[in-house]
Design a protein with these regions (language model features):
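C-terminal accessory "lid"/substrate-recognition subdomains
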Residues: 2-5, 161-224
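Nucleotide-state-sensitive switch-loop elements of NTP-binding domains
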Residues: 2-170
Length: 224
């Protein structure tokens, strides 16, 4: 049975962003193992990158029948898959049995286009996601141990063979800043791997990037 549109507007959406290796998947596993009975729909770019903890499946904490795991293929969620994202979110919302939607962006995704998807009316597809759900949180996971190395590298994504295609001229530093600036929650991960001086300077840097964010520190290898 489908919920009416009034009910469907209550479906909150969280987008998880962060550069490759920052800890997005570990955070996702943590959310799934602490969902407090909520039914969560997960949308990802590449299911092979997500690697949902097998223990969650064995313990019944996650299953493809109880929750929805949707894979978007052949591109970066921020650039080439907006149409796919629109269709999948609408489909999940209309099914009426989802409490929360979590979108894990690709490590090379910029958050802004993903966020715009939830305020964008696609007249060609006839989809208006504001009728079904609301974007509540933009989370960016930052690898505190590698951030400054990546930021100061001067490399392009293509230099690391991480570009979407051969024409992807994006700079890694610019991508990192985009992911930080367009978020309202920053999770500073692997904080245990850096010294106190670096820790304080990193925290000050992220806090000064914008005045809107909640900044949390964590060591995702242990407990968030």
């Amino acid at each position: 049975m489908r919920k009416d549109e009034t009910d469907m507007t209550n479906i909150p959406v969280t987008v998880i962003s962060g550069y490759l290796g920052s800890g997005k998947t570990t955070l996702l596993n943590h959310l799934l193992s602490n969902r407090q009975g909520k039914k969560i729909a997960v949308i990802v770019n590449d299911m092979s990158e997500v690697n949902i903890d097998s223990a969650l499946i064995q313990q019944g904490g996650f299953s493809r029948t109880e929750e929805k795991l949707v894979e978007l293929q052949n591109g970066c969620i921020c650039c080439t898959l907006r149409e796919d994202l629109l269709i999948e979110v609408e489909k999940l919302a209309q099914e009426g049995n989802i409490d929360f939607i979590v979108i894990e962006s690709s490590g090379i995704s910029e958050p802004i286009p993903v966020a715009h998807t939830f305020s964008y009316v696609d007249e060609e597809l006839g989809i208006d996601l504001t009728k079904f759900c609301r974007l509540v949180t933009m989370v960016t996971v930052v690898d505190a141990n590698r951030f400054w190395h990546d930021y100061a590298s001067g490399e392009l994504l293509l230099d690391r063979q991480q570009g979407i295609n051969d024409n992807d001229s994006r700079d890694i530093a610019d991508l990192l800043i985009d992911q930080i600036e367009f978020s309202n929650v920053i999770l500073l991960n692997k904080i245990d791997l850096i010294g106190e001086t670096d820790r304080l300077s990193s925290i000050n840097f992220y806090k000064n990037s914008t005045q809107k964010q909640t900044l949390s520190t964590a060591a995702l290898a242990g407990l968030i």
